[in-house]
């Protein structure tokens, strides 16, 4: 948004050094690793894709930390006049809280072909712009399927009665924490709070809080929701949001 960019990275032997407008670092690095820039551009994906293609395990260590992985989640045939080519939709994970989707050329050393943020941004190789809308549609479908797959892996449906045992309930109205209690839930609602007893009273699911504090769901009063934000909110304890729209 117009802020100055001043970022450098160097590696000499096993020492890596970097400096940005936000931080600076110096660390020892063994073997192959690539710097994850703070103020880079989408074109950096070309470097990442090429480096990943040379890794037999499909994993690329990152500097300062983390590991980048890639998975092909789709393909498309794009056309420019009489010319056509096949490009792959690649999902990159390991940078940020959500995957990044990029379109890559199909080659031994792939490069970035298109970077799309549907409804907001389209970057595509010169001359192939007419394929942008079709690629965006395919990308949205692949992203939706990725979210469905994630939900199937991490969701834990709690049918019937759930007991949260030995929890200390936070009272937000009086800013106090109560004694150990057993909290019963049914269909997503608290039905009863009783003194901790160690009994399960026929509950279908039992979670042992181990004396930890049980907080009510948090409210986020200023959000601009995207497709991946729901899971991130839940992970942070936020159960209610007010979306300020995305215009």
Named regions from a protein language model:
Residues 124-166, 199:
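Extracellular/periplasmic ectodomains of large secreted or surface enzymes and adhesion receptors
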Residues 174-215:
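Histidine-rich, glycine-flanked metal-binding segment
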């Amino acid at each position: 948004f117009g802020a100055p960019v001043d970022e450098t990275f160097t590696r000499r032997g096993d020492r890596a050094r970097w400096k940005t407008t936000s931080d600076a670092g110096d660390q020892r690095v063994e073997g192959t690793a690539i710097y994850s820039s703070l103020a880079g551009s989408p074109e950096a994906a070309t470097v990442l894709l090429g480096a990943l293609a040379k890794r037999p395990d499909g994993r690329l260590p990152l500097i300062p930390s983390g590991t980048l992985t890639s998975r092909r989640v789709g393909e498309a045939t794009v056309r420019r006049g009489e010319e056509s080519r096949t490009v792959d939709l690649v999902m990159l994970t390991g940078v940020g809280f959500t995957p990044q989707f990029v379109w890559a050329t199909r080659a031994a050393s792939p490069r970035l072909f298109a970077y799309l943020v549907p409804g907001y941004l389209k970057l595509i190789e010169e001359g192939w712009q007419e394929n942008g809308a079709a690629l965006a549609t395919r990308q949205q479908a692949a992203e939706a399927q990725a979210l469905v797959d994630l939900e199937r892996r991490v969701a834990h449906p709690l049918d019937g009665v759930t007991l949260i045992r030995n929890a200390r309930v936070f009272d937000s109205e009086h800013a106090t924490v109560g004694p150990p209690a057993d909290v019963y839930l049914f269909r997503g609602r608290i039905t009863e709070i009783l003194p901790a007893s160690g009994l399960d009273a026929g509950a279908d699911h039992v979670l042992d809080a181990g004396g930890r504090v049980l907080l009510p769901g948090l409210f986020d009063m200023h959000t601009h929701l995207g497709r991946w934000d729901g899971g991130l909110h839940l992970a942070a304890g936020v159960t209610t949001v007010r979306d300020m729209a995305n215009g």
